[in-house]
Amino acid sequence: GLIVQPDGSLLITPKIGGESIHRVRVFEVGASTDRTYLLRLLVGAYVAGFTAIHLEAKGRLPPFVRQLVREFTQMAIGQEVVGETDSSIVIKDLLNPAEMPFENTIKRMHLLARGMQQDAMAAIRGHDAALARDVVARDTEVDRLHWLVARQDNLIVIDAALSRRMGIPVNQAAYYFQVSRIVERIADHATRVAHNATALSDREAGAAMLDVMDEASALALEIFSESM
């Protein structure tokens, strides 16, 4: 069928119904499964847009798998355990993508990244190690939002009906993803500043050097905000 996109272009698709596309990813796990590798598989399946993730073991699930799943559901927005047995776990996406517009997510990421950079600089000037550690912790929230944008971008590529419901053409979704990736990198740099603030918390920096750093940071944040 042909679908008229919000930008006036035509999309040719074999599926024009309003129902969502359900995709399931199955992972076999065991005692020898690497923890870090499994977490990457879960995050990858989430970002790729799978609506359900099944973890299956030949015997009982190792305890570390259940713990890792709990950590993953706290990291990934909308993911919840909906089924669990001794040998399997089912994780399902319960978030309606249309309720999380790209623009709102990007704005939230901008505010977080901006606040992180401001607080990281304040931590350096004030020798505040606790504030610096808080900045580092906030980077996880920016990552969560970036993963959500990446997931929704992939979902729109896969599901034309979702593109219509959200009023976002495929090329615009890709643009939001690129912006999200840049903002996530800005937050990463703020995290590096915070790590340095922790290392320098017991050292005294010259007033002139601090003024130069504050001026550079303020200019960078001004450009950042204007670009948004």
How should these model regions be labeled?
Residues 1-228:
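Cytosolic, long alpha-helical scaffolding segments
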